[in-house]
């Protein structure tokens, strides 16, 4: 299973390094080539973000995608729901570190 990290910040003066470090501390090993970093507003729909689209194109069934917070996927609840559903339908294991049930692809996670 390949593990990817999607790290997003909204403004140029912020860094994604804290997200990369949080994922490492949580025990996930992500190769540098699988860390997708993007500086773009969370209000921008996920599939309108160039780096996120490239990430989705790379993902295959059985891959794992880690985000530190659900808002890294977006700020609009409907868009986040669509994005989560799309990833799960692709067979991607989706991990969100700040949720009580971290694995959104699990039976419990799908209830969140």
What residues fall within each predicted segment?
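Short, structured surface patches at the beginning of a domain
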Residues: 1-112
């Amino acid at each position: 299973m390949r593990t990817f990290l999607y790290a997003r910040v909204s403004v140029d003066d912020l860094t994604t390094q804290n997200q990369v470090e949080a994922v490492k501390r949580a025990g996930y090993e992500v190769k540098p080539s699988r860390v997708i970093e993007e500086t773009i507003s969370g209000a921008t729909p996920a599939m309108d973000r160039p780096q996120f689209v490239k990430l989705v194109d790379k993902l295959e069934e059985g891959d794992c995608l880690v985000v530190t917070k659900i808002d890294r996927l977006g700020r609009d609840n409907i868009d986040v729901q669509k994005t989560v559903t799309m990833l799960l339908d692709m067979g991607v294991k989706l991990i969100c570190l700040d949720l009580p049930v971290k694995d959104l692809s699990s039976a419990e996670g799908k209830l969140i």
